[in-house]
Every structure is written in C-alpha cells, then in structure tokens.
C-alpha cells in the first residue's frame, strides 16, 4: 500500500503528468484523464472560454466501493492592488480561519472580505455567488459556482514576500477565490456516481 504525504494542495499536486498527445479541438474539449491504469476514479477537467470563463471538474467513481475526495478550483484573480479590492457575497457566512491554530470558526460580519498586509486564508461555508470588486482596475469579477458548498479565499499578505513561488510584492496583485468541496464538506461517491464542481467567471465595469 502506497502512502502520500498530503499538503494543502491535495494528493494530485505533486503527481507526475505526461503529455501523451495533443490536438486542437474546435470546442476546446479536453479528453478525460485517469489517475493511473488501476485507478478507481476518472476525473475530467473542462474549460470553456468566451465572454465568460467556465471551469468544471467532474469525478466519476469507476470502482466497486464508495470513494471520498476533496476538491477546489484554484482561481488566482488579478487585482490592481489587493488593499483596494473587496470580496462581496459572504456576509453572514461562517468560515474557518486557517491563519490561526486549530482553524477556529468565525462569522463574516462586514459586507466585504478585505485584504492587506495580514494574510487571509479562509474556508467559507457558503454556496453563494460572490463578487470581487476592484477599485484600481475599475471592474467587478463575478464568480458563480455549482456543486460547491464552500468558498476558499486566500492572499498571503506581506508573508508573500518570502514565498518561493512568488517575487516580493506580487501578493499585492492577486486574490485566490476557489469553489471548493473540502474538509467536512468533501464529496463521497457510491460506485458509478459522479459529481461536478464548477465555477463561471465574468467581468463588468465597476459602477462607482
């Protein structure tokens, strides 16, 4: 029995990927990809880009016993300056605060989730759509999701200056907003069952 050391990105994060073939498809369809020849599931990731951007992950249990998994669609959204951006639509939702020991639950009381030099790393219990309002770029990014009981919100704050995967100051230019099904809201599939996690992004001008 093999064992993986799991990090916050899940067991697929450090798996080896192989380009087996490439083909330009009219509708942008991506063929399904199994984890391994002996896999007990099939995962298909579809991306449709036009006036809106839709991403969906469909997992099918191809095995003979129930399977459980967690998933999140990792959307890193560009902002002009994170200090002048706010995420609206989560007011009244409970969230787990991953910046504190034990992930204590908190209540989102302000209308907007705001960002600055302190890190924000939260799992919101909400299936609602949200809006990322960006005063610097003068736009609103609408995030509409389905099959997702949670929304993950992350920005490393000033700690991002010391991350290996980013240059100093880059943390000011993005917010991660992720449709998720994780922790106690993960997905359990009976044999033959499937689940689709999806989100659609659209952009409009911000009305001041």
State where each predicted segment sits.
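Extended, loop-rich substrate-binding clefts of extracytoplasmic carbohydrate-active enzymes
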Residues: 1-50
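Acidic/His-leaning functional-site neighborhoods
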Residues: 2, 114-189
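Short coil/turn motifs at secondary-structure junctions
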Residues: 23-25, 62-64, 80, 204-206
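A short beta-loop-beta micro-motif enriched in histidine and acidic residues
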Residues: 40-41, 70-73, 170
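Short, well-ordered beta-strand segments enriched in hydrophobic/aromatic residues
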Residues: 45-47, 53-61
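Short Pro-Gly-centered flexible turn/kink motifs
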Residues: 57, 188-205
């Amino acid at each position: 029995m093999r064992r993986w050391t799991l990090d916050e990105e899940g067991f697929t994060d450090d798996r080896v990927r192989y380009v087996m073939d490439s083909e330009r498809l009219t509708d942008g369809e991506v063929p399904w990809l199994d984890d391994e020849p002996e896999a007990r599931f099939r995962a298909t990731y579809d991306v449709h880009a036009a006036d809106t951007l839709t991403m969906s992950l469909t997992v099918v249990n191809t095995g003979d016993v129930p399977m459980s998994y967690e998933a999140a669609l990792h959307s890193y959204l560009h902002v002009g300056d994170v200090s002048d951006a706010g995420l609206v639509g989560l007011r009244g939702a409970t969230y787990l605060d991953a910046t504190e020991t034990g992930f204590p639950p908190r209540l989102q009381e302000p209308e907007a989730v705001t960002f600055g030099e302190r890190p924000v790393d939260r799992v919101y219990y909400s299936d609602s759509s949200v809006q990322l309002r960006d005063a610097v770029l003068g736009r609103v990014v609408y995030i509409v999701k389905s099959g997702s009981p949670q929304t993950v919100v992350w920005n490393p704050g000033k700690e991002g200056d010391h991350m290996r995967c980013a240059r100093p100051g880059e943390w000011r230019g993005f917010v991660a907003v992720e449709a998720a099904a994780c922790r106690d809201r993960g997905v359990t599939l009976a044999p033959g069952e499937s689940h689709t996690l999806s989100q659609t992004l659209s952009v409009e001008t911000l009305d001041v």
